[in-house]
């Protein structure tokens, strides 16, 4: 069993419904972003699935996966102009801190966390 499948039932894992992702994408004009990072949305995430349908350029990773990705050490894609995701709440303070650090280091231009 993959690590993701083991953690999918954790109380910290709450999948974002498709209609919410569609509304967010419309509100922020998702097509205007050229390099997007979904740091908590690999596998079956609606963020990723909808991005595929829209042919968006993105990098999708997850805080727990079988590829060794970890939000706190994984680098965003080059020229990342948007990092967007619904991260686990148990790490919210650390996630917000790193998000602002990534902006300060010019590794991402903007972020949106649910």
Labelled PLM ranges:
Residues 1-56, 60:
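S-adenosyl-L-methionine
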Residues 17, 29, 64-72:
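Poly-acidic low-complexity segments
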Residues 24, 35-51, 60-63, 70-100, ...:
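Conserved proline-anchored active-site loop of SAM-dependent methyltransferases
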Residues 31, 101-106:
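Short, conserved loop/helix-junction motifs that constitute active-site signature segments
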Residues 56, 105-109:
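A short helix->loop->beta-strand "cap" motif at the edges of active sites that frequently abuts
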């Amino acid at each position: 069993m993959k690590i993701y499948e083991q953690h999918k039932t954790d109380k910290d894992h709450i999948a974002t419904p498709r209609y919410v992702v569609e509304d967010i994408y419309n509100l922020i004009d998702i097509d205007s972003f050229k390099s997007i990072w979904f740091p908590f949305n690999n596998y079956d995430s609606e963020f990723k699935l909808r991005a595929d349908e829209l042919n968006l350029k993105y990098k999708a990773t997850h805080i727990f996966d079988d590829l060794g990705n970890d939000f706190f050490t994984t680098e965003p894609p080059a020229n990342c102009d948007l990092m967007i995701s619904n991260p686990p709440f148990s790490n919210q303070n650390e996630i917000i801190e790193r998000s602002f650090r990534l902006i300060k280091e010019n590794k991402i231009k903007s972020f949106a966390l649910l």
